[in-house]
């Protein structure tokens, strides 16, 4: 066991109660030094002693002082009967006090009581709290800097493909927006309930012109779903065809001239043609050939029908006899007659 000396000042009444002698006359002021045990490993003391220094002389006799020392083994009373003994006692008490002060342990040795494990535990807790605070600050700062509706925000919410998926044709699986259990629509009162909150829709009133513009704009959004129909100029629009999907082509266009010549069933059957000239191109070519042949026949027939008056203008004046002239006239009349009969037959056919 180690001990630390402590300085205690006792009054007269406390000293009398501790000694237990009623007849003992103590001085007015005493200085008592006692040793108090403290758990220190580096110094060990087994004795517990105390001594009393009398600061002022007293009228008590030396015999009484000797009796007091015999009654209490642990208390040593030093008395000075004359003024010549006071300096010696004071020097002895001061030296004893200095020796006790030198035995006090420094602060460094008291700090060794803290174990190394507790220090490391404290360091780990402090580092954890610091890292959590830094992470929370960084997350909050990044959310503030990231604008709502940016590309990164849309990718994070799944509304836009990321840069590495833009070339992939496979679509992502999204939830059905028209069958969302968290969104409830009420068509009667025009209210929408989303996430537990009810929103009332404001009424929208559009003029007829605005309604037609809106319908056309919405119809263009689904233009890819409706096929484009080609009609010849002057034809009537079928009842089940949207006028916005009709494209007018001129009457002299090859597509317009071959519409009646191409059979729809044949066109459907020849969709997967792999060999030879495509069916549509061949049909268009054949139709154009027929029309050209018909035009050429009409021109030939028109050239064959020549009037007699116009033919006389192209004839040269010959100086022959009357017989030759009569023969030529008969031949011309016969040729004209055969030409007219052939033209009538072609018209009838």
Swiss-Prot record:
Disruption phenotype: Heterogeneous population of chloroplasts with variable size and multiple division sites. Abnormal subplastidial localization of the key plastid division proteins FTSZ1 forming multiple rings. Normal shape and number of etioplasts in cotyledons. The double mutant mcd1 arc6 exhibits similar chloroplast defect than the single mutant arc6, including the abnormal localization of FTSZ1 to short filaments and dots within chloroplasts. It comes from the Eukaryota. Residues 315-349 are annotated as: Disordered. It is found in: Plastid, Chloroplast inner membrane. Residues 53-116 are chloroplast intermembrane. It is a single-pass membrane protein. The chain crosses the membrane at residues 117-139. Residues 1-52 form a transit peptide. GO terms for cellular component: chloroplast envelope; chloroplast inner membrane; chloroplast intermembrane space; chloroplast stroma; nucleus. InterPro entries: MCD1. Residues 329-343 have a biased composition (Polar residues). Its main location: plastid. Keywords: Chloroplast, Membrane, Plastid, Plastid inner membrane, Transit peptide, Transmembrane, Transmembrane helix. The keyword ATP-binding does not apply. Residues 140-349 are stromal. GO terms for biological process: chloroplast fission. The keyword Transit peptide applies. Interacts with MIND1. Interacts with ARC6 in the chloroplast stroma and binds to FtsZ2-1 in an ARC6-dependent manner. PANTHER family: PROTEIN MULTIPLE CHLOROPLAST DIVISION SITE 1. This is Protein MULTIPLE CHLOROPLAST DIVISION SITE 1. The gene is MCD1.
């Amino acid at each position: 066991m180690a001990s630390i000396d402590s300085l205690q000042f006792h009054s007269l009444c406390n000293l009398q109660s501790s000694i237990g002698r009623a007849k003992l006359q103590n001085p007015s002021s005493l200085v008592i030094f006692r040793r108090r045990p403290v758990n220190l490993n580096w110094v060990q003391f087994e004795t517990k002693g105390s001594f009393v220094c009398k600061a002022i002389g007293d009228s008590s006799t030396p015999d009484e002082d000797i009796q007091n020392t015999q009654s209490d083994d642990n208390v040593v009373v030093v008395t000075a009967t004359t003024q010549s003994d006071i300096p010696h006692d004071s020097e002895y008490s001061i030296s004893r006090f200095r020796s006790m002060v030198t035995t006090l342990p420094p602060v460094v040795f008291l700090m060794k009581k803290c174990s190394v494990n507790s220090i490391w535990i404290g360091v780990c807790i402090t580092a954890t709290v610091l890292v959590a605070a830094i992470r929370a600050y960084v997350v909050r700062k990044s959310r503030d800097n990231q604008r709502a509706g940016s590309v990164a925000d849309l990718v994070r919410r799944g509304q836009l493909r990321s840069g590495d998926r833009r070339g992939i044709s496979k679509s992502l699986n999204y939830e059905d927006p028209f069958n969302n259990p968290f969104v409830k629509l009420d068509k009667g009162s025009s209210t929408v309930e989303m996430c537990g909150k009810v929103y009332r829709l404001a009424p929208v009133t559009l003029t007829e012109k605005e309604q037609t513009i809106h319908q056309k704009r919405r119809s263009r959004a689904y233009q890819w779903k409706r096929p484009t129909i080609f009609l010849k100029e002057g034809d009537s629009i079928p009842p089940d065809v949207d006028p916005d999907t009709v494209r007018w082509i001129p009457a002299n266009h090859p597509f317009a001239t071959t519409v009646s010549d191409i059979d729809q069933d044949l066109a459907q059957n020849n969709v997967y043609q792999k060999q030879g000239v495509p069916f549509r191109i061949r049909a268009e070519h054949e139709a154009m050939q027929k029309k050209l042949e018909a035009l050429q026949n009409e021109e030939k027939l028109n050239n064959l029908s020549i009037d007699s008056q116009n033919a006389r203008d192209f004839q040269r004046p010959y100086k022959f006899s009357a017989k030759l002239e009569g023969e030529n006239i008969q031949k011309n009349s016969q040729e004209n007659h055969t030409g007219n009969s052939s033209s009538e037959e072609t018209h009838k056919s």
